[in-house]
């Protein structure tokens, strides 16, 4: 089972690696807020909520990051701020937040699995595919277990964190 898990995880990480350009662009967008006078507001959904404190309060949190909890908080965001929305899937709630951000002309990044039903991800300017749409490890009864959303997000997060750290270092050298 461990070999299958390892092989499947490597496949997910390879799919994420193929999005490196999108991840770099998303990191640059978020860094515009962190390096300027703005903040990075982070809204997580469903099981990804467990990762929110890490992104905003840990020793390796995104710079100038804050948790975003309610839609009415969007009115406090200005043009110097950016928003990061992270969910396992495109839910009605995530789509509602996307609509509100678009209505308010706020720059944002979305990390989630592709929206196979409605193709919402195709209309986004800054989108990173989580690449974990289903469980990956087969069992003896032919079902599958382990849907590694958090592992995939952690991998994407650390790529973004490293990119943003490098940008900070480059800016400090100038």
Q: Model-found features: residue ranges?
A:
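Generic N-terminal amphipathic, Lys/Arg-enriched alpha-helix
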Residues: 1-17
């Amino acid at each position: 089972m461990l070999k299958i898990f390892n092989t499947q995880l490597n496949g997910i990480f390879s799919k994420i690696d193929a999005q490196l350009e999108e991840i770099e662009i998303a990191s640059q967008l978020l860094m515009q807020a962190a390096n300027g006078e703005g903040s990075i507001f982070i809204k997580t959904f469903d099981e990804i909520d467990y990762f929110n404190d890490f992104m905003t309060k840990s020793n390796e949190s995104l710079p100038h990051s804050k948790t975003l909890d309610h839609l009415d908080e969007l009115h406090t965001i200005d043009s110097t701020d950016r928003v990061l929305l992270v969910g396992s899937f495109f839910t009605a709630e995530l789509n509602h937040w996307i609509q509100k951000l678009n209505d308010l002309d706020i720059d944002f990044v979305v990390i989630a699995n592709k929206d196979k039903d409605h193709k919402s991800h195709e209309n986004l300017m800054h989108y990173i595919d989580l690449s974990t749409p289903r469980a990956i490890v087969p069992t003896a009864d032919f079902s599958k277990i382990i849907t590694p959303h958090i592992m995939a997000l952690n991998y994407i997060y650390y790529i973004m964190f490293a990119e943003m750290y490098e940008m900070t270092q480059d800016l400090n050298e100038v």
